[in-house]
Amino acid sequence: MSLKIVVLAKQVPDTRNVGKDAMTPEGTVNRAALPAIFNPEDLNALEQALRLKEQNPDSTVHILTMGPPRATEVIREGLYRGADGGYLLTDRAFAGADTLATSYALAQAIKKIGVPDIVLGGRQAIDGDTAQVGPQVAQKLDLNQVTYVTSVDEVKDGKVVVTRHIDGGIERVEAPMPILLTVNGNAAPCRPRNAKLVMKYKRASAPMERPAEGLPYAEEYDKKPYLTIAQWSVADVDGDLAQCGLAGSPTKVKAVQNIVFKAKESKRLTGSDADVESLVKELLDSHTIG
């Protein structure tokens, strides 16, 4: 059977390179000051989507992301790996969204796309670590949902069979479509870019990124429709401004503090009985042990 699949993906700050300017005074992430990457667990979700596409002829995979214009890089990365297209939600009114406002915007976009058979997304984004957006989108769209998925094993008779991680082990679950699945980081890693697809889609862009008329490559977008990445605003997805961005975000950050890790004084032990006895006493006194 053919499947209509949407992958929720996010461009996130690389938290391995966080500096003193990582946060704004308002308590939101200063994305301009941090290098951006494809959210790791969203890549795991993309791989599951691409495997389903291979197993079910005539299926399609589209990437949906919300962010500034540079977030189209996430969609291009998906195209380079085998996705069929993408949608960029970009509007100043989306800025500063918490999980509630983010899930509202994504749900509105999915309604515009047409509710797919399967929505896939990473368990959580590394910039927030909430694991809330996927379940919230499912709730807003009244979709079945399974979280902490490690593999999508089978699609049959309008149902999906998945393996999911639970406390103390794994669980095999069957659930009817349409369905939203959130995928763990211990699922199969995403395949690398395909060189032919990189050459095909390297100039894929949203209208906001387009070169001016008369510049090199500008005419390609008329001749090659597949290079166009759909770009939607709040109005395009029939969104309510009161539920978008900061206006629709009840989560408020009380304070932000930059923490600088400094090397502490070290102590060298010789291994003598006296040193070991002294160390044990120190650990007991500090309640580290005992």
Task: Report the location of each language-model feature.
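N-terminal glycine-rich FAD/FM-binding segment characteristic of electron-transfer flavoproteins
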Residues: 1-290
